[in-house]
Amino acid sequence: MQLKNNEKYKNYFENKKYNITTFGCQMNEHDSERISYILEDLGYTRTDDRNDADFILFNTCLVRENAELKLYGQVSSLKKLKEENPEKIIAVSGCMMQTSVAREVIEKKHKEVDIIFGTKNINSLPDLLFKYLETGERVIDVSEDNVKDDYVNYNSKNNFQAYVNIMRGCDNFCSYCIVPQSRGREESRRPSHIIEEIENLVKNGYKEITLLGQNVNSYGNKSDFNVTFPELLEKCAKIEGVERLRFTTSHPKDLSDDLIRVIKENDNICNYFHLPMQSGSDKVLKDMNRKYNKEQYLEKARKLKEEIPGIAISTDIIVGYPTETEEDFQETLDVCRKVGFDTAFTFKYSPRPKTKAAKLDPIDDKIVQDRFDRLLDTLYPIFNEKNKEYIGKEVEVLLESESKNNKNILTGRTDTFKLVHVKADKNLIGQIVKVKITDNTSFTISGELV
Protein backbone atom coordinates (compact mmCIF):
# COMPACT_ATOMS: atom_id res chain seq x y z
CA MET A 1 0.00 0.00 0.00
CA GLN A 2 1.72 3.12 -1.29
CA LEU A 3 -0.08 5.44 1.12
CA LYS A 4 0.62 3.46 4.30
CA ASN A 5 4.35 3.29 3.63
CA ASN A 6 4.66 6.92 2.57
CA GLU A 7 6.68 8.90 5.14
CA LYS A 8 4.70 12.08 4.48
CA TYR A 9 1.46 10.44 5.66
CA LYS A 10 2.96 8.07 8.24
CA ASN A 11 1.06 9.62 11.17
CA TYR A 12 -1.61 11.43 9.17
CA PHE A 13 -4.45 9.00 9.97
CA GLU A 14 -3.77 8.39 13.67
CA ASN A 15 -6.57 10.64 14.93
CA LYS A 16 -8.77 10.41 11.84
CA LYS A 17 -12.23 8.82 11.87
CA TYR A 18 -14.26 7.19 9.12
CA ASN A 19 -17.94 6.44 8.54
CA ILE A 20 -19.43 3.99 6.03
CA THR A 21 -23.05 3.84 4.86
CA THR A 22 -23.94 0.65 3.00
CA PHE A 23 -26.90 0.18 0.67
CA GLY A 24 -28.05 -3.15 -0.74
CA CYS A 25 -27.19 -6.82 -0.45
CA GLN A 26 -24.84 -8.98 1.61
CA MET A 27 -22.15 -8.66 -1.06
CA ASN A 28 -22.19 -4.90 -0.55
CA GLU A 29 -22.01 -5.43 3.21
CA HIS A 30 -18.97 -7.65 2.71
CA ASP A 31 -17.36 -5.07 0.42
CA SER A 32 -17.83 -2.50 3.19
CA GLU A 33 -16.11 -4.89 5.61
CA ARG A 34 -13.13 -5.00 3.24
CA ILE A 35 -13.08 -1.20 2.96
CA SER A 36 -13.27 -0.92 6.75
CA TYR A 37 -10.21 -3.15 7.13
CA ILE A 38 -8.23 -1.06 4.64
CA LEU A 39 -9.10 2.19 6.40
CA GLU A 40 -8.27 0.86 9.86
CA ASP A 41 -5.04 -0.61 8.53
CA LEU A 42 -4.11 2.94 7.50
CA GLY A 43 -4.89 4.21 11.00
CA TYR A 44 -8.50 5.41 10.82
CA THR A 45 -10.96 4.55 13.62
CA ARG A 46 -14.65 3.99 12.99
CA THR A 47 -17.42 6.34 14.08
CA ASP A 48 -21.18 6.00 13.73
CA ASP A 49 -21.52 9.79 13.65
CA ARG A 50 -21.15 10.96 10.07
CA ASN A 51 -20.66 14.57 11.20
CA ASP A 52 -17.67 13.49 13.29
CA ALA A 53 -15.99 11.59 10.45
CA ASP A 54 -12.97 12.77 8.47
CA PHE A 55 -13.62 10.19 5.73
CA ILE A 56 -17.24 9.55 4.70
CA LEU A 57 -18.02 6.72 2.30
CA PHE A 58 -21.24 5.57 0.64
CA ASN A 59 -21.19 2.01 -0.72
CA THR A 60 -24.00 2.01 -3.24
CA CYS A 61 -26.65 -0.30 -4.69
CA LEU A 62 -28.27 0.02 -8.11
CA VAL A 63 -30.75 -2.86 -7.99
CA ARG A 64 -33.69 -0.57 -7.17
CA GLU A 65 -34.37 3.10 -7.72
CA ASN A 66 -35.17 3.73 -4.05
CA ALA A 67 -31.58 3.04 -2.94
CA GLU A 68 -30.28 5.25 -5.75
CA LEU A 69 -32.47 8.20 -4.73
CA LYS A 70 -31.50 7.76 -1.06
CA LEU A 71 -27.84 7.99 -2.05
CA TYR A 72 -28.31 11.25 -3.95
CA GLY A 73 -30.22 12.75 -1.04
CA GLN A 74 -27.66 11.75 1.57
CA VAL A 75 -24.72 12.98 -0.50
CA SER A 76 -26.47 16.31 -1.07
CA SER A 77 -26.96 16.70 2.68
CA LEU A 78 -23.15 16.80 3.08
CA LYS A 79 -22.60 19.88 0.90
CA LYS A 80 -22.74 22.27 3.84
CA LEU A 81 -20.54 19.99 5.96
CA LYS A 82 -17.94 19.91 3.17
CA GLU A 83 -18.07 23.70 2.78
CA GLU A 84 -17.51 24.19 6.51
CA ASN A 85 -14.67 21.66 6.59
CA PRO A 86 -13.06 21.19 3.14
CA GLU A 87 -10.59 18.69 4.60
CA LYS A 88 -13.35 16.10 5.02
CA ILE A 89 -13.07 13.46 2.32
CA ILE A 90 -16.29 12.14 0.74
CA ALA A 91 -16.19 8.95 -1.33
CA VAL A 92 -18.79 6.99 -3.28
CA SER A 93 -18.19 3.36 -4.26
CA GLY A 94 -20.08 0.25 -5.28
CA CYS A 95 -22.48 -0.87 -7.98
CA MET A 96 -23.83 2.55 -8.92
CA MET A 97 -20.33 3.71 -9.82
CA GLN A 98 -19.89 0.79 -12.23
CA THR A 99 -22.57 2.25 -14.51
CA SER A 100 -21.98 5.41 -16.52
CA VAL A 101 -25.49 6.83 -15.99
CA ALA A 102 -25.32 6.91 -12.18
CA ARG A 103 -21.64 7.82 -12.13
CA GLU A 104 -22.26 10.87 -14.32
CA VAL A 105 -24.91 12.12 -11.89
CA ILE A 106 -22.34 12.06 -9.08
CA GLU A 107 -19.61 13.57 -11.27
CA LYS A 108 -21.71 16.44 -12.61
CA LYS A 109 -24.16 17.24 -9.80
CA HIS A 110 -22.21 16.40 -6.65
CA LYS A 111 -18.95 18.33 -6.64
CA GLU A 112 -18.60 17.58 -2.93
CA VAL A 113 -17.60 13.98 -3.76
CA ASP A 114 -13.81 13.57 -3.83
CA ILE A 115 -13.24 9.89 -4.59
CA ILE A 116 -15.24 7.56 -6.85
CA PHE A 117 -14.45 3.86 -7.27
CA GLY A 118 -16.22 0.68 -8.33
CA THR A 119 -16.79 -2.82 -7.03
CA LYS A 120 -13.53 -4.08 -8.56
CA ASN A 121 -11.30 -1.32 -7.21
CA ILE A 122 -11.52 -1.73 -3.43
CA ASN A 123 -7.89 -2.82 -3.09
CA SER A 124 -6.86 0.42 -4.85
CA LEU A 125 -8.40 2.64 -2.16
CA PRO A 126 -5.08 3.52 -0.43
CA ASP A 127 -3.62 4.65 -3.76
CA LEU A 128 -6.74 6.67 -4.55
CA LEU A 129 -6.51 8.34 -1.15
CA PHE A 130 -2.83 9.09 -1.71
CA LYS A 131 -3.54 10.65 -5.10
CA TYR A 132 -6.37 12.79 -3.69
CA LEU A 133 -4.30 14.01 -0.74
CA GLU A 134 -1.44 14.91 -3.09
CA THR A 135 -3.49 16.75 -5.72
CA GLY A 136 -6.67 17.85 -3.95
CA GLU A 137 -8.52 16.90 -7.13
CA ARG A 138 -11.28 14.33 -7.58
CA VAL A 139 -10.03 10.79 -8.18
CA ILE A 140 -11.99 8.17 -10.15
CA ASP A 141 -11.21 4.47 -10.66
CA VAL A 142 -13.83 2.15 -12.12
CA SER A 143 -11.44 0.02 -14.18
CA GLU A 144 -12.27 -3.62 -14.81
CA ASP A 145 -8.82 -5.17 -14.37
CA ASN A 146 -8.15 -4.69 -10.66
CA VAL A 147 -9.67 -7.92 -9.32
CA LYS A 148 -7.32 -10.40 -7.68
CA ASP A 149 -8.45 -13.85 -6.61
CA ASP A 150 -6.52 -13.82 -3.37
CA TYR A 151 -7.22 -13.91 0.36
CA VAL A 152 -8.57 -10.49 1.32
CA ASN A 153 -8.69 -9.17 4.88
CA TYR A 154 -11.84 -7.53 6.20
CA ASN A 155 -13.54 -6.40 9.39
CA SER A 156 -16.60 -8.57 10.02
CA LYS A 157 -19.67 -7.11 11.72
CA ASN A 158 -18.82 -9.27 14.75
CA ASN A 159 -16.32 -11.96 15.73
CA PHE A 160 -18.52 -15.01 15.20
CA GLN A 161 -20.21 -14.53 11.78
CA ALA A 162 -18.45 -13.91 8.48
CA TYR A 163 -19.23 -13.58 4.79
CA VAL A 164 -17.00 -15.32 2.26
CA ASN A 165 -17.22 -14.45 -1.43
CA ILE A 166 -17.04 -17.53 -3.63
CA MET A 167 -17.76 -15.78 -6.93
CA ARG A 168 -18.48 -12.42 -8.50
CA GLY A 169 -20.85 -11.29 -11.22
CA CYS A 170 -23.76 -12.89 -13.05
CA ASP A 171 -24.38 -14.32 -16.54
CA ASN A 172 -28.16 -14.69 -16.36
CA PHE A 173 -29.28 -11.31 -17.73
CA CYS A 174 -32.78 -11.22 -16.26
CA SER A 175 -34.64 -8.51 -18.15
CA TYR A 176 -35.19 -6.30 -15.09
CA CYS A 177 -31.75 -6.69 -13.47
CA ILE A 178 -28.67 -4.50 -13.77
CA VAL A 179 -26.30 -6.77 -11.82
CA PRO A 180 -24.44 -8.13 -14.90
CA GLN A 181 -23.61 -4.52 -15.80
CA SER A 182 -22.71 -3.41 -12.27
CA ARG A 183 -20.97 -6.57 -10.99
CA GLY A 184 -19.74 -7.95 -14.31
CA ARG A 185 -19.77 -11.48 -15.69
CA GLU A 186 -19.37 -14.58 -13.53
CA GLU A 187 -15.93 -15.26 -12.04
CA SER A 188 -15.45 -18.08 -9.54
CA ARG A 189 -12.74 -18.02 -6.88
CA ARG A 190 -10.48 -21.02 -6.58
CA PRO A 191 -11.72 -23.60 -4.05
CA SER A 192 -8.34 -23.66 -2.29
CA HIS A 193 -8.55 -19.89 -1.63
CA ILE A 194 -12.07 -20.21 -0.25
CA ILE A 195 -11.13 -23.15 1.98
CA GLU A 196 -8.06 -21.28 3.26
CA GLU A 197 -10.16 -18.21 4.08
CA ILE A 198 -12.73 -20.26 6.02
CA GLU A 199 -10.02 -22.18 7.89
CA ASN A 200 -8.47 -18.89 9.00
CA LEU A 201 -11.86 -17.58 10.12
CA VAL A 202 -12.55 -20.72 12.17
CA LYS A 203 -9.10 -20.48 13.79
CA ASN A 204 -10.09 -16.99 14.90
CA GLY A 205 -13.31 -18.21 16.54
CA TYR A 206 -15.92 -17.66 13.84
CA LYS A 207 -18.89 -20.01 14.17
CA GLU A 208 -21.12 -19.14 11.20
CA ILE A 209 -19.93 -18.74 7.61
CA THR A 210 -22.11 -17.46 4.76
CA LEU A 211 -20.93 -18.17 1.21
CA LEU A 212 -21.81 -15.33 -1.15
CA GLY A 213 -22.45 -15.17 -4.88
CA GLN A 214 -24.98 -13.63 -7.25
CA ASN A 215 -25.87 -17.20 -8.23
CA VAL A 216 -23.90 -19.68 -6.14
CA ASN A 217 -25.43 -22.60 -8.04
CA SER A 218 -23.40 -21.69 -11.14
CA TYR A 219 -20.12 -21.69 -9.21
CA GLY A 220 -17.27 -23.14 -11.26
CA ASN A 221 -19.16 -23.17 -14.57
CA LYS A 222 -16.54 -21.20 -16.54
CA SER A 223 -13.45 -22.14 -14.55
CA ASP A 224 -10.43 -24.31 -15.24
CA PHE A 225 -11.03 -26.25 -12.02
CA ASN A 226 -13.57 -29.05 -11.97
CA VAL A 227 -15.55 -28.24 -8.81
CA THR A 228 -19.31 -27.66 -8.67
CA PHE A 229 -21.13 -25.69 -5.97
CA PRO A 230 -22.45 -28.82 -4.18
CA GLU A 231 -18.88 -30.16 -4.12
CA LEU A 232 -17.52 -26.85 -2.78
CA LEU A 233 -20.28 -26.66 -0.16
CA GLU A 234 -19.47 -30.18 1.04
CA LYS A 235 -15.76 -29.33 1.28
CA CYS A 236 -16.61 -26.25 3.37
CA ALA A 237 -18.94 -28.26 5.61
CA LYS A 238 -16.11 -30.71 6.36
CA ILE A 239 -13.81 -27.98 7.70
CA GLU A 240 -13.33 -28.63 11.40
CA GLY A 241 -14.89 -25.92 13.55
CA VAL A 242 -17.54 -24.67 11.11
CA GLU A 243 -20.65 -24.83 13.29
CA ARG A 244 -23.04 -23.20 10.82
CA LEU A 245 -22.77 -22.85 7.06
CA ARG A 246 -25.11 -20.74 4.93
CA PHE A 247 -25.12 -19.58 1.32
CA THR A 248 -26.95 -17.09 -0.87
CA THR A 249 -28.25 -16.61 -3.53
CA SER A 250 -29.51 -19.61 -5.55
CA HIS A 251 -31.13 -19.34 -8.98
CA PRO A 252 -34.01 -21.85 -9.17
CA LYS A 253 -33.05 -23.07 -12.65
CA ASP A 254 -29.70 -24.30 -11.32
CA LEU A 255 -30.88 -25.96 -8.10
CA SER A 256 -29.72 -29.58 -8.38
CA ASP A 257 -30.59 -32.82 -6.60
CA ASP A 258 -26.93 -33.04 -5.61
CA LEU A 259 -27.14 -29.73 -3.72
CA ILE A 260 -30.22 -30.94 -1.85
CA ARG A 261 -28.34 -34.14 -0.96
CA VAL A 262 -25.35 -32.20 0.41
CA ILE A 263 -27.59 -30.05 2.62
CA LYS A 264 -29.43 -33.12 3.87
CA GLU A 265 -26.26 -35.07 4.72
CA ASN A 266 -24.35 -32.31 6.53
CA ASP A 267 -25.81 -31.21 9.86
CA ASN A 268 -23.85 -27.95 9.98
CA ILE A 269 -25.39 -26.68 6.73
CA CYS A 270 -28.37 -24.62 7.84
CA ASN A 271 -31.88 -25.80 6.97
CA TYR A 272 -32.70 -22.56 5.20
CA PHE A 273 -32.94 -22.00 1.47
CA HIS A 274 -33.45 -18.68 -0.30
CA LEU A 275 -35.11 -19.48 -3.63
CA PRO A 276 -36.05 -16.28 -5.53
CA MET A 277 -39.32 -16.78 -7.39
CA GLN A 278 -39.90 -13.20 -8.70
CA SER A 279 -43.26 -14.19 -10.27
CA GLY A 280 -45.60 -17.17 -10.37
CA SER A 281 -46.74 -16.52 -13.94
CA ASP A 282 -45.19 -18.53 -16.77
CA LYS A 283 -45.66 -15.59 -19.14
CA VAL A 284 -44.01 -13.07 -16.82
CA LEU A 285 -41.20 -15.49 -15.95
CA LYS A 286 -40.49 -15.87 -19.67
CA ASP A 287 -40.56 -12.09 -20.14
CA MET A 288 -38.15 -11.78 -17.21
CA ASN A 289 -35.81 -14.34 -18.85
CA ARG A 290 -35.83 -16.47 -15.70
CA LYS A 291 -35.54 -19.79 -17.60
CA TYR A 292 -37.98 -21.77 -15.44
CA ASN A 293 -41.76 -21.94 -15.16
CA LYS A 294 -44.25 -22.12 -12.32
CA GLU A 295 -44.43 -25.91 -12.16
CA GLN A 296 -40.66 -26.27 -12.22
CA TYR A 297 -40.36 -23.83 -9.33
CA LEU A 298 -43.05 -25.64 -7.33
CA GLU A 299 -41.30 -28.96 -7.96
CA LYS A 300 -37.98 -27.56 -6.65
CA ALA A 301 -39.70 -26.29 -3.49
CA ARG A 302 -41.55 -29.60 -3.04
CA LYS A 303 -38.34 -31.59 -3.34
CA LEU A 304 -36.55 -29.37 -0.80
CA LYS A 305 -39.34 -29.90 1.73
CA GLU A 306 -39.62 -33.62 1.03
CA GLU A 307 -35.89 -34.35 1.33
CA ILE A 308 -35.14 -31.94 4.20
CA PRO A 309 -38.06 -31.94 6.69
CA GLY A 310 -38.37 -28.65 8.54
CA ILE A 311 -36.40 -26.63 6.00
CA ALA A 312 -37.39 -22.97 5.78
CA ILE A 313 -37.78 -21.46 2.31
CA SER A 314 -37.68 -17.74 1.61
CA THR A 315 -38.08 -15.96 -1.70
CA ASP A 316 -37.98 -12.70 -3.66
CA ILE A 317 -41.14 -11.42 -5.35
CA ILE A 318 -41.50 -8.53 -7.80
CA VAL A 319 -44.95 -7.00 -8.21
CA GLY A 320 -45.89 -4.82 -11.16
CA TYR A 321 -43.50 -6.03 -13.84
CA PRO A 322 -44.58 -4.14 -16.99
CA THR A 323 -46.23 -7.16 -18.68
CA GLU A 324 -47.95 -8.45 -15.51
CA THR A 325 -51.75 -8.73 -15.69
CA GLU A 326 -54.17 -9.38 -12.85
CA GLU A 327 -54.27 -13.03 -13.94
CA ASP A 328 -50.47 -13.19 -13.76
CA PHE A 329 -50.54 -11.67 -10.29
CA GLN A 330 -53.04 -14.30 -9.14
CA GLU A 331 -50.56 -16.98 -10.28
CA THR A 332 -47.97 -15.41 -7.96
CA LEU A 333 -50.40 -15.53 -5.04
CA ASP A 334 -51.12 -19.17 -5.89
CA VAL A 335 -47.44 -20.10 -5.59
CA CYS A 336 -47.22 -18.27 -2.25
CA ARG A 337 -50.08 -20.36 -0.87
CA LYS A 338 -48.80 -23.65 -2.29
CA VAL A 339 -45.19 -23.27 -1.12
CA GLY A 340 -45.94 -21.64 2.24
CA PHE A 341 -42.89 -19.39 2.39
CA ASP A 342 -41.32 -18.73 5.78
CA THR A 343 -40.51 -15.19 4.71
CA ALA A 344 -40.27 -13.17 1.52
CA PHE A 345 -38.49 -10.08 0.25
CA THR A 346 -41.14 -8.20 -1.68
CA PHE A 347 -40.61 -5.35 -4.13
CA LYS A 348 -42.51 -3.14 -6.49
CA TYR A 349 -40.93 -3.28 -9.93
CA SER A 350 -38.28 -0.61 -10.38
CA PRO A 351 -37.03 0.15 -13.92
CA ARG A 352 -33.23 0.06 -14.16
CA PRO A 353 -31.23 1.83 -16.88
CA LYS A 354 -29.93 -0.25 -19.79
CA THR A 355 -32.14 -3.24 -18.99
CA LYS A 356 -34.63 -4.73 -21.47
CA ALA A 357 -37.58 -4.22 -19.14
CA ALA A 358 -36.85 -0.49 -18.84
CA LYS A 359 -38.01 -0.07 -22.45
CA LEU A 360 -41.50 -1.40 -21.64
CA ASP A 361 -44.47 0.77 -20.71
CA PRO A 362 -44.99 0.73 -16.93
CA ILE A 363 -48.15 -0.31 -15.11
CA ASP A 364 -50.12 2.42 -13.34
CA ASP A 365 -48.68 3.08 -9.86
CA LYS A 366 -52.06 2.66 -8.16
CA ILE A 367 -52.49 -0.81 -9.65
CA VAL A 368 -48.98 -1.81 -8.58
CA GLN A 369 -49.56 -0.54 -5.04
CA ASP A 370 -52.87 -2.40 -4.81
CA ARG A 371 -51.23 -5.66 -5.89
CA PHE A 372 -48.36 -5.10 -3.50
CA ASP A 373 -50.78 -4.59 -0.60
CA ARG A 374 -52.70 -7.74 -1.53
CA LEU A 375 -49.46 -9.70 -1.76
CA LEU A 376 -48.56 -8.73 1.80
CA ASP A 377 -52.10 -9.51 2.96
CA THR A 378 -51.58 -13.01 1.55
CA LEU A 379 -48.06 -13.54 2.87
CA TYR A 380 -48.29 -12.27 6.45
CA PRO A 381 -50.81 -14.89 7.66
CA ILE A 382 -48.62 -17.58 6.05
CA PHE A 383 -45.55 -16.28 7.89
CA ASN A 384 -47.54 -16.23 11.12
CA GLU A 385 -48.65 -19.85 10.72
CA LYS A 386 -45.11 -20.99 9.90
CA ASN A 387 -43.76 -19.26 13.01
CA LYS A 388 -46.57 -20.60 15.18
CA GLU A 389 -45.31 -24.12 14.41
CA TYR A 390 -42.26 -23.36 16.59
CA ILE A 391 -44.25 -22.77 19.80
CA GLY A 392 -43.38 -25.42 22.37
CA LYS A 393 -40.25 -26.50 20.52
CA GLU A 394 -36.65 -26.18 21.74
CA VAL A 395 -34.40 -24.64 19.10
CA GLU A 396 -30.73 -23.72 18.89
CA VAL A 397 -30.16 -19.98 18.48
CA LEU A 398 -26.97 -18.10 17.66
CA LEU A 399 -27.33 -14.93 19.73
CA GLU A 400 -26.24 -11.92 17.67
CA SER A 401 -26.99 -8.67 19.49
CA GLU A 402 -29.00 -6.75 22.06
CA SER A 403 -32.52 -5.78 21.07
CA LYS A 404 -32.77 -2.16 19.94
CA ASN A 405 -35.87 -1.69 22.09
CA ASN A 406 -34.86 -3.58 25.25
CA LYS A 407 -31.26 -4.21 26.32
CA ASN A 408 -32.40 -7.10 28.53
CA ILE A 409 -33.50 -8.94 25.40
CA LEU A 410 -31.06 -10.55 22.97
CA THR A 411 -31.83 -11.37 19.35
CA GLY A 412 -30.48 -14.22 17.31
CA ARG A 413 -31.23 -16.69 14.53
CA THR A 414 -32.17 -20.34 14.35
CA ASP A 415 -30.52 -22.43 11.66
CA THR A 416 -33.76 -21.89 9.71
CA PHE A 417 -33.05 -18.13 9.89
CA LYS A 418 -35.94 -17.36 12.23
CA LEU A 419 -35.38 -14.16 14.19
CA VAL A 420 -35.59 -15.01 17.91
CA HIS A 421 -36.02 -12.73 20.94
CA VAL A 422 -34.98 -14.11 24.33
CA LYS A 423 -34.17 -12.63 27.74
CA ALA A 424 -30.49 -13.35 28.31
CA ASP A 425 -27.24 -11.82 29.52
CA LYS A 426 -25.27 -9.96 26.85
CA ASN A 427 -22.24 -12.12 27.69
CA LEU A 428 -24.00 -14.86 25.71
CA ILE A 429 -23.77 -12.87 22.45
CA GLY A 430 -21.86 -15.01 19.97
CA GLN A 431 -22.92 -18.27 21.63
CA ILE A 432 -25.33 -20.91 20.38
CA VAL A 433 -27.94 -21.52 23.09
CA LYS A 434 -31.14 -23.56 23.44
CA VAL A 435 -34.40 -21.62 23.57
CA LYS A 436 -37.91 -22.93 24.19
CA ILE A 437 -40.30 -20.98 21.97
CA THR A 438 -43.36 -19.56 23.73
CA ASP A 439 -44.72 -16.88 21.37
CA ASN A 440 -44.60 -15.61 17.81
CA THR A 441 -45.53 -12.86 15.37
CA SER A 442 -45.46 -12.97 11.57
CA PHE A 443 -41.81 -11.92 11.66
CA THR A 444 -40.30 -13.21 14.91
CA ILE A 445 -40.45 -15.97 17.49
CA SER A 446 -39.61 -15.55 21.17
CA GLY A 447 -38.96 -17.78 24.13
CA GLU A 448 -36.94 -18.65 27.22
CA LEU A 449 -33.45 -20.02 27.71
CA VAL A 450 -33.41 -23.74 28.44
Across the structure, where does each feature detected by a protein language model lie?
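Flexible glycine/acidic-rich beta-alpha junction loops that bind and position SAM and/or redox cofactors
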Residues: 97-102, 213-222, 255-258, 277-288, ...
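Terminal RNA-binding accessory module
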Residues: 351, 358-450
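Conserved glycine-rich "GG(E/T)P / GGGxP" loop and the immediately following alpha-helix
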Residues: 62-67, 206-231, 235, 239, ...
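Proteins enriched for Cys/Gly/acidic motifs involved in redox and nucleic-acid/cofactor modification
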Residues: 1-219, 228, 269, 273, ...
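Short, electropositive alpha-helical surface patch
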Residues: 224-234, 257-271, 324-341, 366-369, ...
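Short acidic/polar active-site loop segments enriched in Thr and Asp
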Residues: 207, 243, 342
